[in-house]
From Swiss-Prot:
One Gene Ontology cellular component: plasma membrane-derived thylakoid membrane
Keyword Cytoplasm: no
Naturally occurring in which organism (per UniProt): Prochlorococcus marinus (strain MIT 9515)
Keyword Lipid metabolism on entry: no
Family: Belongs to the complex I NdhM subunit family.
PANTHER family (alphabetical): NAD(P)H-QUINONE OXIDOREDUCTASE SUBUNIT M, CHLOROPLASTIC
Function: NDH-1 shuttles electrons from an unknown electron donor, via FMN and iron-sulfur (Fe-S) centers, to quinones in the respiratory and/or the photosynthetic chain. The immediate electron acceptor for the enzyme in this species is believed to be plastoquinone. Couples the redox reaction to proton translocation, and thus conserves the redox energy in a proton gradient. Cyanobacterial NDH-1 also plays a role in inorganic carbon-concentration.
Name of the featured protein: NAD(P)H-quinone oxidoreductase subunit M
Amino acid sequence: MEKMLLKSTTRHVRIFTAEVVNNDLKYHPNKLTLDLDPDNEFIWNEESLKKVNQKFTELVEERAGKSLDDYELRKIGSEVEGLIKYLLQNSLLSYNPECRVMNYSMGLPKTKEVL
């Protein structure tokens, strides 16, 4: 029986048991692919992207030898989502004012007027 591609989706993180081949996702039992901020809700800088990718790599390496099932994918996605919130709260990431829908999904921005 052929295995199905698994995915875990949070608001800002999508993880697939796949690799990208010619811009298509192809199932791979031992590889994960990260799709970060698919709605472009944030403005990313190189440092923030690097931190998220490093965290993702750490989380995947911690699970080496474990089954890449729905539960493990959700745990990884939740931890990456938590890092995104941390980056936003510490002004290392900002909301994108050009985003299709501005809903402040991780809380209102901190500005001098609000503080």
